[in-house]
Amino acid sequence: MPGSNHFPLLKFYLENPGYDYYWVVEDDVFFTGEWTDLLKCCQHRGADFLSSYVRDYKEEPDWSWWGSLSGAEEIPLESRVHSFNPIYRLSSRALAYVHDKLSQGWSGHHEVLLPTLLRYGGFSVADLNGDGGLLYDETTHSHLPLPTGKRKPGMIYHPIKEKTPGCLALKRNCVIAAVGKNSLHREWRKGKTEPDFDLHLIVYDQSFNCIL
């Protein structure tokens, strides 16, 4: 199911359960300040789940993924909550609860599954823009391409992506490879002629920042 990127987080949590809080940050998120300051800004906030654009069904009934949530019991649409999760924080006890619920058969897009299950289970769910602070707005943090212009200090920006042509020409072949630190995939594209394949990588170890 699309929106299942909470599973790598849960795997890490189960292998490393000693933290109080776990932050997830997509690789196209940028903060115009010190990341340490961002974490400190949220340090005094005890919410089990912190994210952005936290909305209930009444506020945004046309959101696409409300119906993806399913499990052992029915949570009415009016009781469901969604968030926007390019950057979010979960407490250790919240992750333990989510893991338990998934083990019972719950599933859904993580932007509805996480906030809904947690609020329904009595955990605290809060917006990053709470307590009078402003860490994002619609001009800095969105699912749409951002307008160009001067960046505001101390704000979360998303998406930070390079623009690509609207009709990207695909090669005849697609090579999908699971790669790690000692991968030889760089050699595959060397040669005098342009290779007739697109290369897509699945990184299976901790070498994310040095794999290309």
Spans of model-derived segments:
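Active-site-proximal specificity loops/subdomain of glycosyltransferases
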Residues: M1-P17
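Short, amphipathic alpha-helical segments
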Residues: G3-H6, V29-G33
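Short, hydrophobic/aromatic alpha-helical segments in well-folded domains
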Residues: P8-K11, V24-V25, E34-L38, L113-L114
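Short, surface-exposed basic-aromatic patches at helix termini and helix-loop junctions that form
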Residues: L14-P17, T36-R45, R119-F123
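Short beta-strand-to-loop acidic/aromatic patch adjacent to the donor-nucleotide binding site
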Residues: Y19-D28
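Conserved catalytic core of nucleotide-sugar-dependent glycosyltransferases
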Residues: F31-V112
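C-terminal catalytic/acceptor-binding lobe
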Residues: H99-C210
